């Protein structure tokens, strides 16, 4: 949804980064954004290539404490969490700061619960980045969003990949948690 919002607000180019094939395909099909699979590419190098060496003007981190990666950074964060030295895995926000162009903006929309380690404050300062974080308090946007949905500018039906009864709730949560059967969102009906 952040990618679609960026496009509606006039972003010239939108690149979505993920590792799950079903989400990458959904993004390409329903949003029209370019996609990168971080498990098979050097995201920073790829973003520099796509932007003529500068990096993106704006980076949106939308996964928060649930971010994943491969390699030592992920292992480091997992160990710190097990030792209760940090609460979250700030991999995506770190990468957003490192990828963003000088003078750019980084927005953190993902949920974080507490402390993080290895936050690249030096890069944030030296690049002169603007960092904003927000939990969505969007009641004031509901009328505008409903108008855009009515005009067909925003569609959401593709997000509900698994519709099931409330009785199947535990199964739906398992599908979502374990990323099984292409589950992006389980929606429960009474």
Predicted regions and their residues:
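Mid-domain Rossmann-like dinucleotide-binding core that forms the NAD(H)/NADP(H) cofactor-binding site
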Residues: 1-41, 45, 60
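Short conserved loop adjoining the S-adenosyl-L-methionine
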Residues: 43-49, 69
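A glycine-rich helix->loop->beta "capping" turn
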Residues: 50-58
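C-terminal hydrophobic helical "lid"/dimerization subdomain
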Residues: 53-54, 94, 138-190
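Glycine-rich phosphate-binding loop and adjacent beta-alpha segment
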Residues: 63-151, 158, 190
């Amino acid at each position: 949804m952040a990618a679609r919002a960026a496009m509606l607000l006039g972003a010239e180019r939108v690149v979505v980064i993920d590792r799950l094939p079903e989400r990458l395909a959904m993004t390409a099909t329903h949003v029209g954004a370019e996609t990168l699979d971080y498990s098979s590419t050097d995201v920073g190098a790829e973003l520099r290539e796509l932007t003529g060496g500068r990096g993106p003007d704006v980076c949106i981190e939308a996964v928060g404490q649930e971010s994943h990666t491969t390699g030592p950074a992920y292992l480091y964060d997992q160990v710190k969490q097990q030792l209760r030295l940090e609460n979250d895995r700030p991999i995506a926000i770190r990468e957003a700061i490192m990828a963003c162009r000088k003078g750019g903006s980084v927005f953190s929309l993902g949920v974080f619960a507490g402390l993080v380690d290895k936050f690249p404050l030096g890069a944030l300062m030296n690049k002169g980045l603007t960092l904003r974080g927000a939990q969505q308090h969007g009641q004031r946007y509901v009328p505008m969003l409903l108008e855009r949905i009515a005009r067909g500018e925003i569609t959401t039906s593709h997000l509900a990949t698994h519709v099931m009864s409330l009785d199947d709730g535990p199964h739906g949560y398992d599908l979502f948690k374990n990323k099984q059967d292409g589950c992006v969102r389980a929606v429960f009906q009474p």
